A protein has these predicted regions:
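Acidic interaction surfaces
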Residues: 2-112
Length: 112
């Protein structure tokens, strides 16, 4: 179904309000856990913050706004991330980090 410009603007307004509500609810829930809960959930907190910024400030396609309206989209993206990306990304990232550290150490030794 195609939407006219006014309908898309209305959908975007509802979408942004929905994302803001979802993010605010998550933040309140996490902060109720205290400092230990914040530490335990730090990766999820960072993920939510970055996805929130992306959804609020980048231009999505009109189809995305329509499809995501009414969905707890940040939560659903977190679920996808934890199942498909997190296990692979953490290991790959740490391997790259160790490799970069070693390369930097070699360069510093050569320069000394």
């Amino acid at each position: 179904m195609r939407y006219n410009k006014e309908e898309i603007e209305e959908i975007k307004i509802k979408f942004f309000a929905q994302v803001q509500d979802e993010y605010d609810y998550f933040r309140k829930k996490v902060t109720k856990k205290g400092i230990e809960g914040v530490y335990a959930d730090s990766l999820q907190i960072t993920f939510y913050k970055e996805v929130y910024r992306y959804l609020m400030y980048d231009n999505l396609s009109e189809d995305d706004y329509v499809q995501f309206l009414g969905e707890p989209i940040i939560k659903k993206l977190w679920e996808v991330f934890t199942v498909s990306e997190l296990p692979r990304q953490s290991r790959d990232y740490l391997r790259q980090l160790v490799k970069l550290y070693r390369e930097n150490e070699k360069e510093q030794r050569r320069a000394a």
